Amino acid sequence: MAITRRSFLKGVATTSAASVIGPSLLASASANAVETTGTWKVSGSHWGAFRAHIYAGKVQEIKPIELDQNPTEMLNGIKGIIYSPSRVRYPMVRLDWLKKHKYSADTRGNNRFVRVTWDEALDLFYRELERVQKEYGPWALHAGQTGWNQTGSFNNCTAHMQRAVGMHGNYITKVGDYSTGAGQTILPYVLGSTEVYAQGTSWSEILENADNIILWANDPVKNLQVGWNCETHESYAYLAQLKEKVAKGEINVISVDPVKNKTQRYLENDHLYVNPMTDVPFMLAIAHVLYTENLYDKKFIETYCLGFEEFINYVQGKTKDKVEKTPEWAAPICGVKADKIREFARMLVKGRTQILMGWCIQRQEHGEQPYWAAAVVAAMIGQIGLPGGGISYGHHYSSIGVPSTGFAGPGGFPRNLDAGMKPKWDNNDFNGYSRTIPVARWIDCLLEPGKEINYNGGKVKLPDFKMMVISGCNPWHHHQDRNRMKQAFQKLQTVVTIDFAWTATCRFSDIVLPACTQWERNDIDVYGSYSSRGLIAMHRLVDPLFQSKPDFQIMKELTERFGRSEEYSRGMSEMDWIRSLYNDCKKSNEGKFEMPEFDEFWEKSVLDFGQGQPWVRHADFRQDPEINPLGTPSGFIEITSRKIGRYGYEHCQEHPMWFEKSERSHGGPGSDKHPFWLQSCHPDKRLHSQMCESEEFRATYAVKGREPVYINPLDAKAKGIKEGDLVRVFNDRGQLLAGAVLTDSYPRGVIRIEEGAWYGPLSEKVGAICTYGDPNTLTQDIGSSELAQATSANTCIVDFEKFTGKVPPVTSFGGPIEVA
């Protein structure tokens, strides 16, 4: 059966075909049939490739390109980003910082700024770089914050900033990321690679061979709307086929999740509820059943794995805790009845079973453990390396699972200095501090400078940095515990932010420089992050608005101030670079993919290389583990890691274990005071915080102008809350306002506020309520363990009540308070 967009959409009961394309696009499509004025240009985004109708110098309409058969409704929000009232329009400097020249931090966050010229702003930026390198050294400058940026091979804003700043002097940077910090650290010890960003078994192989698919804390229907590069959305065709197979009883799909997520509602598959943050006890009990009932694949364990005996001794209660991890032990913790645990374990070994893990589950305290334990369960099943079997950690991300064509995409603008180059301040003395820090521990540097922490087998001494340069990312979205951040930012002398949107990060900065959006400059990008379906020309749709500039131009002008502009740009313009990147790409793909000359490509705008060949992850390892070893120390799957064991960590030991959380709902620590688990997962209508500023699109989901909080109707009734009421959500770390949405997709004791909601404090003071609904006002800022030191955002419990006070205005949007 041919898979169409309609066949996919009709399964989502809460989403109509019109809403996915977007009413404004459907409404304007008929008018466009007779539109003869203006031009259409192709461009791209994290939300997919599109054609934009340009008339009178403005973007009038956006339509997905023909290759995208399952476009996301978020394309409707792109116009709202370009023309948002929250655009950074002019270079701005914080009033008190400029006025007092003493790096006054007590009023940081009051959003009062002075407009200055570009020359004044860049002079101040350069002055601060000089001062910090001269007075302190490279340890005092942090320029390592990164995020999703915008798409495009050339215009990577972080690369532009770090090359320019790096030409001036060295600086503190980071390792890891917020999305998969725990997972990408633990899995190389267990499976030999980070796995989370690796291409997975092709969907076609899974659909053809799997009898059971376990979606463990995984919501691909929601998350596949966006991609790291310009996304194709080809995965949705496979999900449509999966829906048909579920309906016919050909594949058994079970969602293991505290909530009934969008994918479960679309597929209409079975749902197995597990108490939040208790998947590990459930997994340990599964391992107990598989072992005691002799259901595990002993031959696979003996041939491909190391350390099973130590792990199974722990499961049997033969180690120091003396607790046997039976289903009866796990049931009161995880909320799954003992008989159901046994039934689930037995099902896993009946036929071919594919486990598909999500990322949210590892963003918690001890987040390394569920990924490690899941790998052990998959090893006991014994199907790793078989079509439709084994385990994946990425089938909800970008186009993982869509066969790759093998096309080698274009390179990018160089982040590092060219060979032989040295910075103006060629100083490598970091004063005993670590040059690289775990990405989620930077606030600790400000509050506990000089502290030595464990990290991944080594030691990190937290640097006492004084200045930050932030480009194209929003740490006041992706980091945790806003009030702790407020306290930490009092320690900073200077914060420079380069962005196109006035985020909370801009609010808490000292110098803000207006970058343009990706649709106000030219670029190229791979079409399909993992499928490498083709290549997209990203045409500039309109000229940069207000006084915004491309990052390339901003950094050229900065490097002019210390005589390095020509070296920075290599004497090339934007289009010189794009042409060069294309030609290098053409050369590297010679004999494999036919690519026209650049001018023809630029006019054509889209190169389509078709679909790739199916592939099975770990098949080569299974075929011959000696010739094709994993990247672990032994080359085998390490159920027990002696290397980790030698680290001597308390909270991440030599094999997967259950560690109680510092706080947990459903009878866990702290639940008597704050009984509800707050799930702050990836949003359905944004890419993290990108698109929250798009006013018309935000209005399609906001509740009374606030971020939605999803509540079980019985929990809401107990607190006198009705649909649409304003709700105050709170704990000891902070408080926020959100709009109530009542739904039985969320069990009692669980609420959801999606991450990426823009922080809008009522004031700069610690403890001020967030007026819009940023969940990171409430989350705790602790490392997952000594191993990964990753974010633990989902270890968060709260309480809530109907808000009955005077309703404050939302302060998140609209830019700064400009002071003459």
UniProtKB/Swiss-Prot annotation:
<keyword id="KW-0732">Signal</keyword>
<comment type="function">
    <text>Reduces trimethylamine-N-oxide (TMAO) into trimethylamine; an anaerobic reaction coupled to energy-yielding reactions.</text>
</comment>
<protein>
    <recommendedName>
        <fullName>Trimethylamine-N-oxide reductase</fullName>
        <ecNumber>1.7.2.3</ecNumber>
    </recommendedName>
</protein>
<dbReference type="GO" id="GO:0030288">
    <property type="term" value="C:outer membrane-bounded periplasmic space"/>
</dbReference>
<dbReference type="Pfam" id="PF18364">
    <property type="entry name" value="Molybdopterin_N"/>
</dbReference>
<dbReference type="GO" id="GO:0050626">
    <property type="term" value="F:trimethylamine-N-oxide reductase (cytochrome c) activity"/>
</dbReference>
<keyword id="KW-0574">Periplasm</keyword>
<dbReference type="InterPro" id="IPR041460">
    <property type="entry name" value="Molybdopterin_N"/>
</dbReference>
<dbReference type="InterPro" id="IPR006657">
    <property type="entry name" value="MoPterin_dinucl-bd_dom"/>
</dbReference>
<keyword id="KW-0560">Oxidoreductase</keyword>
<comment type="similarity">
    <text>Belongs to the prokaryotic molybdopterin-containing oxidoreductase family.</text>
</comment>
<dbReference type="Pfam" id="PF00384">
    <property type="entry name" value="Molybdopterin"/>
</dbReference>
<feature type="signal peptide" description="Tat-type signal">
    <location>
        <begin position="1"/>
        <end position="33"/>
    </location>
</feature>
<dbReference type="Pfam" id="PF01568">
    <property type="entry name" value="Molydop_binding"/>
</dbReference>
<dbReference type="InterPro" id="IPR041954">
    <property type="entry name" value="CT_DMSOR/BSOR/TMAOR"/>
</dbReference>
<dbReference type="InterPro" id="IPR009010">
    <property type="entry name" value="Asp_de-COase-like_dom_sf"/>
</dbReference>
<dbReference type="InterPro" id="IPR006655">
    <property type="entry name" value="Mopterin_OxRdtase_prok_CS"/>
</dbReference>
<dbReference type="InterPro" id="IPR006656">
    <property type="entry name" value="Mopterin_OxRdtase"/>
</dbReference>
<keyword id="KW-0479">Metal-binding</keyword>
<dbReference type="InterPro" id="IPR050612">
    <property type="entry name" value="Prok_Mopterin_Oxidored"/>
</dbReference>
<dbReference type="GO" id="GO:0009061">
    <property type="term" value="P:anaerobic respiration"/>
</dbReference>
<keyword id="KW-0500">Molybdenum</keyword>
<dbReference type="GO" id="GO:0043546">
    <property type="term" value="F:molybdopterin cofactor binding"/>
</dbReference>
<feature type="binding site">
    <location>
        <position position="179"/>
    </location>
    <ligand>
        <name>Mo-bis(molybdopterin guanine dinucleotide)</name>
    </ligand>
</feature>
<dbReference type="InterPro" id="IPR006311">
    <property type="entry name" value="TAT_signal"/>
</dbReference>
<dbReference type="GO" id="GO:0030151">
    <property type="term" value="F:molybdenum ion binding"/>
</dbReference>
<dbReference type="InterPro" id="IPR011887">
    <property type="entry name" value="TorA"/>
</dbReference>
<dbReference type="InterPro" id="IPR019546">
    <property type="entry name" value="TAT_signal_bac_arc"/>
</dbReference>
<dbReference type="GO" id="GO:0009055">
    <property type="term" value="F:electron transfer activity"/>
</dbReference>
